[in-house]
């Protein structure tokens, strides 16, 4: 049942974020995925035991785009994740700017990155791992009032991520 729930969740996340065809293959205890987003969803589910879709649109930073002041520590985790991706993108270690969203990296299961990753893969995996662990740390303070949050109306756009 959990496998079916996770598969359904990954499909919903991919549709929500306009990323299509989230397929996974498993080799030993390392997982490679066709889309980085599906891997982050798997890490998040592992650390929070919550459907990752619940975090899409949470607060001012969780999901696509983010600005303003984080509403709580969970939203701060998402802001940090956005900043981590931006740092990797700005560093130029990945071959093109959208690589951070499409990079296939290897995990040791859970929210741990495999040592058998190229530099771009490893940095993207680290961003996802740190964020998933952060979300797991604060899983008990998840507040439904911040799910589906009105970013345009409630997040202060003068505090954009730069």
From Swiss-Prot:
Organism annotation: Calliactis polypus
Organism domain of life: Eukaryota
EC code(s) of this entry: 3.1.1.4
Source lineage: Eukaryota, Metazoa, Cnidaria, Anthozoa, Hexacorallia
Enzyme class: hydrolase
Protein name: Phospholipase A2
PANTHER family documented for this protein: PHOSPHOLIPASE A2 FAMILY MEMBER, PHOSPHOLIPASE A2-ALPHA
Cofactor note: Binds 1 Ca(2+) ion.
Signal sequence residues: 1-22
InterPro entries recorded: PLipase_A2, PLipase_A2_dom, PLipase_A2_dom_sf, PLipase_A2_His_AS
């Amino acid at each position: 049942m959990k496998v079916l729930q996770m598969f359904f969740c990954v499909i919903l996340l991919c549709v929500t974020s306009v990323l299509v065809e989230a397929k996974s293959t498993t080799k030993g205890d390392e997982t490679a995925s066709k889309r980085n987003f599906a891997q982050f969803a798997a890490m998040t589910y592992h650390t929070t035991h919550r459907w990752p879709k619940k975090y899409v649109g949470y607060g001012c930073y969780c999901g696509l785009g983010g600005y303003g002041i984080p509403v709580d520590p969970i939203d701060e985790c998402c802001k940090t994740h956005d900043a981590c991706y931006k740092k990797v993108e700005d560093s130029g270690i990945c071959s093109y700017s959208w690589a951070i969203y499409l990079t296939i990296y290897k995990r040791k299961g859970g929210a741990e990155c495999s040592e058998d990753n190229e530099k771009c893969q490893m940095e993207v995996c680290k961003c996802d791992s740190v964020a998933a662990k952060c979300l797991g740390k604060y899983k008990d303070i998840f507040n439904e009032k911040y799910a589906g949050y009105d970013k345009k109306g409630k997040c202060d756009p003068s505090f954009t991520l730069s």
